[in-house]
Amino acid sequence: PDETARLVDRLVDRRLTWSEAAGIFGTVFHPLAQWAALTRGTTTGSTIVTPDGRWVDPPLEGELASDLLALVASILTGHTTTPDDGIVALWEGHGALLGHMGEGPSRAFFQMGDPADPVLAHHNRMLGTSVKDAWNNVFRRKTWQEGILSREISESPRLELPGRGHVLFRGGVSELARPDWFLDVPWRDRPAEEHGFDPSALSPSIVWPADRAWVLVSEVDYDSTVIGGSREMIAALVAASDLEALEIP
């Protein structure tokens, strides 16, 4: 041949549904399925490789993606008499959510750039030692380390459940039904935005309306969100084409 051409496969980054994963790995997707068993793995916390060579990241544990939360909230809004009033709870153990007394911050933002840049290298070394300095921390006086939430909220009482403490906020599920709900919540991650990250906020751990018509729970160690409520509400969630929801028997 006079010429040759190179054909490369396209890189695709998209969501993989649980039912699709079951088809790929030859398993069965059912209401009590767990990701590790569904993908024939031993853990839910690491990337797996499909039989045809694709890489698949595990689902988020302990929270819903922001767009899925908005979709779920839009459905739940129609199944309560108090869509504008209720409780939103966040697990206190999320990294950097709360301020604390300590020798250094709970996280640091390292900057990417030219490795040969001496200023950048010095900055990143400083950040590294500010997070962990085993030799000098023994002698360092503890000071207040800021979190995403204010000191007043960080030191406030908690909703104590077995093995879990939660920070509570008063708010309605209707506020979470907007696609950009994370822009107006008190726990918006503004420190991350100051370092160039897109606006974001943690998905709530627990949500319930004032009339207690239903409850949404994203347990921190679970790969799914569980919602309890009326048969009509469950049917609406299961029927939503953009959600992968199943009724628990």
How would you label these PLM feature ranges?
Residues 192-207:
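An N-terminal amphipathic alpha-helical segment
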Residues 1-194:
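Extended, low-hydrophobicity segments enriched in charged/polar residues
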Residues 152-158, 201-203, 212:
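Intrinsically disordered, low-complexity boundary segments flanking structured domains
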Residues 170-171, 175, 210, 217-218:
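Generic structural "secondary-structure junction" signal
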Residues 212-249:
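Alpha-helical oligomerization segments
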Residues 165-166, 205, 213, 224:
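Generic secondary-structure boundary/loop-capping signal
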Residues 157-160, 206, 217-218, 236:
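A general structural signal for short secondary-structure junctions and capping/turn motifs
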Residues 177-179, 203-213:
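Active-site and NAD+-binding cores of ADP-ribose-processing enzymes
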